[in-house]
Amino acid sequence: MIRLAEITRVFRMGDQEVRALNRISLDIASGEYVSIMGPSGSGKSTLLNVIGLLDRSDSGRYELDGADVTDLSENERARVRREKVGFVFQSFHLVPRLTAAENIELPLILEGVNPAERTSRVGAALDAFDLRDR
C-alpha cells in the first residue's frame, strides 16, 4: 500500500519558488491501478519520482507497505526501491550491446539471484513475450 499524507515538493529557481506538489494526500491499496493525469507542469512526474523514491518531498509523510519511508538514507531508499517499487520510465533504454535475455538477466544478477533461478526466470520472460530469438 502507498500512503501519502500532506506531501509538498518545492523547487527553487533563483528567487522564485515553484510548488510542484502542494499538500498531496492519497492512499493506493495493494493491487489497485491508478492513472495520474494532468497538463504539462502539473506535478505528475514529481509525484511519481517521490512515490518511486527517486526524489524526496520537502514535507509530509510517505508510507510504503506500512513502513515510513519519508526520511530513509539514500542506500535505504535504493534498497526499498529495488525490493518494492516497479518503475517504467516514459523513455527507457535497454543496454544495446546485450541480447534480450542478457537485458532481462541484468537486474537479477544485481539482485543476487542464483544462476539456475536466473535462467528459469529469463526463459519464462522470453517465452511470455515471444522473444526467444532476440
Can you say where each PLM-predicted feature lies in the sequence?
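A short, flexible loop at the N-terminus of ABC-type nucleotide-binding domains that lies
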Residues: 1-4, 10-23
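ABC ATPase NBD coupling module
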Residues: 15-18, 69-86
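Short beta-strand immediately N-terminal to the Walker A/P-loop
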Residues: 34-35, 87
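The feature captures the beta-strand-to-loop junction immediately N-terminal to the Walker
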Residues: 37-39
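Helix-to-loop junction immediately C-terminal to a conserved catalytic motif
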Residues: 52
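ATP-binding/catalytic-site motifs of ATP-hydrolyzing domains
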Residues: 61-63, 67
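Conserved ABC ATPase "signature" region
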Residues: 67-68, 109-112, 116-134
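Short coil-to-helix segment of the ABC ATPase nucleotide-binding domain corresponding to the Q-loop/switch region
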Residues: 98-107
